[in-house]
Amino acid sequence: MSKPAVKSVQSATAKTATRAVNIRQKVKAPKQAKPEGKGSTKPVKDRPRVEIKKALHPRNAHLNGYDFPALISAFPRLKTFVRPTPYGALSIDFADPLAVKTLNAALLKHHYGIGAWDIPQGALCPPIPGRVDYVHYVADLLAEGDKSCAISKARVLDIGTGANGIYPILGSQVYGWQFVASDISAHSLTNVQSIIEQNPALQGRISLRLQPDDKAVFKGIVQPEERFELTLCNPPFHASMAEASEGTKRKVNNLQLNRGSSVKAAPKLNFGGQAAELWCQGGERQFLATMIRESQMFADQCLWFTSLVSKQENLKPCYQALAQLKVDTVKTIEMQQGNKITRVLAWSFQSAAKRKLWRAEHLAR
């Protein structure tokens, strides 16, 4: 994607909302599966991948829930939205978009040093604990246990950064990564540019690129001779605006039922999202198919390609597509946040030996 005159930011799609204040995660034992051979050069077969089931990542700052007194101290405006629950804990109304946006602003300020963060009305408001979990797991994926690896030197591409720019913000603040963030929406990128300009800690760390082709993923964004250690993406998973609206209503109704409200209440929600953030032709499955197909064009320019996969049934066609491309290594990381389960699908065209050489050349301490 060509850079717009003004640094642009991409539209990331964040589609989950967390109701529980104290996020309690159960660690599930991993399923017994035949492990993949490290560095195997055999084509990937269509078989279940080893899935790592865990609670929030051990390095996740939100592992023990939200410390509302500390968050209010850092961001006093949050106090307006905090109420005691019937169980004696503090919480907010997670169906109130303004409350959720204010909580995000408080979390970003208290934990990540971001003093100014805002999104346009109707834009996707991401759950911070789940988003930073993705960042932590791909950081481990990149290092592969190599203690000589300085992952802070990594260059990362965020596909569809959205108006919130959450992955570049978290990745740059937690690990010091350099980001290219792309999006098909100039409006979204303009908002991310505004966030960058208001936060000195982000300046010089995030480059924004507008994707001129709404049917492309990497084409038009990755430049010749450019190198990335990681790509990140939270793809739109609905196939139409009508489907996205139905999904939103379902989530709102579930929240209202859980808190004892009438399901006929007006559907105010934190499951916002502009069109490009929520749906695309063919939905998540088609988006992932395009991403996998295009990744082959940049096989030697990127060490690890990764994406969130919201729908379990979309994994099998992804495995089949990767097998056809003779991808060297495929990994699936299952993440759980409350009742929400999502997966990180990761693949590399490089063998284990080549990945080690890549780290030695580009990420050595």
Curated annotation (Swiss-Prot):
Its EC number is 2.1.1.181. It is an enzyme of class 2 (transferase). It comes from the Bacteria. Residues 33-48 have a biased composition (Basic and acidic residues). GO terms for molecular function: 23S rRNA (adenine(1618)-N(6))-methyltransferase activity. Keywords: Cytoplasm, Methyltransferase, rRNA processing, S-adenosyl-L-methionine, Transferase. It is found in: Cytoplasm. It catalyses: adenosine(1618) in 23S rRNA + S-adenosyl-L-methionine = N(6)-methyladenosine(1618) in 23S rRNA + S-adenosyl-L-homocysteine + H(+). GO terms for biological process: rRNA base methylation. Its main location: cytoplasm. One of its GO terms (cellular component) is cytoplasm. InterPro entries: METTL16/RlmF, rRNA_lsu_MeTfrase_F, SAM-dependent_MTases_sf. Residues 1-48 are annotated as: Disordered. SUPFAM superfamilies: S-adenosyl-L-methionine-dependent methyltransferases (SSF53335). Pfam families: Methyltransf_10. Belongs to the methyltransferase superfamily. METTL16/RlmF family. Specifically methylates the adenine in position 1618 of 23S rRNA. This is Ribosomal RNA large subunit methyltransferase F. It comes from Shewanella baltica (strain OS223).
